[in-house]
């Protein structure tokens, strides 16, 4: 079973539609929930298919950041989950920039969680190893089982 979840804070100075637009540059969600934590709204977006990450897959290649993406994705594997964060302001202008901590994105990072039976298979699809910047393989989207 596949579950892709994206979590982002919407602070009082931010427009929820702009945060949704930033996320939508990389992720096609099926379901959205919002909860309140003090004065901050928390967006929780979900999808049950890896095809929801096709934009993310394409951007990794267009921006030529497969090697750094692979490093962040591999580092984020724990059990059957991959967790990583991207810079919210960069995402708002369509640029993918990974961050190590929430503090690196002043308005909070966008957090991705991908649950899958074999997380390494997802990493190999999204960000394959490269030689001189060229992917060594181009795997199809793993099946949503």
Swiss-Prot record:
Coiled coil: none annotated. InterPro entries: PAB1135-like, Ribosomal_uL5_dom_sf. Disulfide bonds: none annotated. Belongs to the UPF0201 family. HAMAP family: UPF0201 (MF_01112). PANTHER family: UPF0201 PROTEIN TK1335. This is UPF0201 protein SSO1042. It comes from Saccharolobus solfataricus (strain ATCC 35092 / DSM 1617 / JCM 11322 / P2).
